[in-house]
Design a protein with these regions (language model features):
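Non-catalytic structural scaffold of enzyme domains
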Residues: 1-164
Length: 164
């Protein structure tokens, strides 16, 4: 059973600063919550790393967040979600809630694009993991997913290109 306290912070992490957009959405929707954001710019980008390396990085980040008694950990990185979500579920156990960024995207697609063709760009790891295809096929929502690995995506996001 989870032993969470309402006044404990929410922990959010990403391989860099791109997850700050998700952190902002959390702040906008939950303005009374405190938050700890961890941007792992030391190992940026995750998308070209091995699954084992990413799992090691995120285990250290999760330890850092758990030491600060977060009640919820939000993985704001698609590559980390693809590589480590299941491992982190087991690792964290009942010490905190765990949320990834892939499941909400799948839910949105299934509710709004069933029977349609959808394009997906992502890191090499995210695309090669097949996680989006797997989750879409489990829902049987007939989405024709066209996925393309885009190596320059992370540098573009990290440089703030979309803000200009």
């Amino acid at each position: 059973m989870l032993n969470l306290k309402a006044d404990h912070p929410i922990g959010i992490f990403d391989s860099g600063v791109g997850g700050l957009t998700i952190a902002k959405a959390v702040i906008d929707n939950l303005p009374n919550e405190s938050m700890i954001y961890f941007g792992d710019t030391k190992h940026l980008p995750y998308g070209d790393k091995s699954i084992q390396a990413i799992q090691g990085y995120v285990r250290e980040i999760v330890d850092f967040l758990l030491e600060r008694e977060v009640k919820l950990i939000l993985i704001a990185c698609h590559s980390a979600s693809a590589a480590a979500y299941e491992m982190l579920q087991n690792y964290i156990g009942n010490r905190a809630l765990l949320v990834n960024v892939i499941d909400p995207v799948i839910k949105f697609l299934s509710e709004n694009y069933a029977g349609k063709r959808v394009g997906l760009i992502g890191t090499k790891l995210t695309i090669q993991s097949g996680i989006y295809h797997k989750k879409i096929s489990e829902l049987e929502c007939q989405i024709d997913l066209c996925a393309l690995a885009t190596p320059l995506l992370v540098p573009i996001i990290e440089e703030g290109f979309f803000e200009h």
